[in-house]
Amino acid sequence: MTAQTDSWADATIASLQAKGHRNSGARRAVVELLGRQDCCLTAQEIFDQLRAEGRRVGIASVYRVLEQLSKDGFVQRIDIGAGTTRFEPIHAGGEHHHHLVCDDCGKVEAFADDQLERALQKVEGRTGYSVAGHDVVLRGACRDCAPAR
C-alpha cells in the first residue's frame, strides 16, 4: 500500500468512529480493500476478494458498508450501465479520473484527460451552474474486444 491509500483507510476509519460508527470487521475489511484499489469495484467483486483473502464478511454487510461510505462521502458510486454500480475511494486532493467500460467483456479502465476537464469547466462557466462534481463513463469495446466486432 502507498502512503495515500494507508492514510485514506486510516482517515476513513477514524472519521467513521468519530461519527459513532463501530469499527466492525466488515467495515475495516471493505475500507482496507478499497484503499488498495486503482479503480472501482462492484459490491460482488469486493465480497469475492475479501472471501478469497479469508475474510468472513457477508454480502449484506458489504452493501451496508458501501452505502455508509457513500453517504459519508468516502466512496464514489459509479453507474456503469446495465444496473451495475461500482465503488471507489474518494482521495482528498487525489487524482480525478473517469472510466472506460467495455460493453462486450465488462472490463473497466480509469483514464484522465486534461482537455476533457477543461471542456467540462467551460460548461460550468457557460451555464452558470456551480458544479460540485462529475463522472464521465465512456462505453464501447476495449482493445481486446474491438477486433471481434
Protein language model annotation of sequence segments:
Residues A9, A26-R27:
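Short, leucine-enriched amphipathic alpha-helices that occur as contiguous helical runs
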Residues K71-R149:
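Non-DNA-binding regulatory cores of transcription-related proteins
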Residues V62-D72:
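Basic amphipathic alpha-helical segments that dock to polyanions
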Residues G25, R36-T42:
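Short capping segments at the starts of secondary-structure elements
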Residues E45-R51, V62:
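A short acidic, leucine-rich amphipathic alpha-helix
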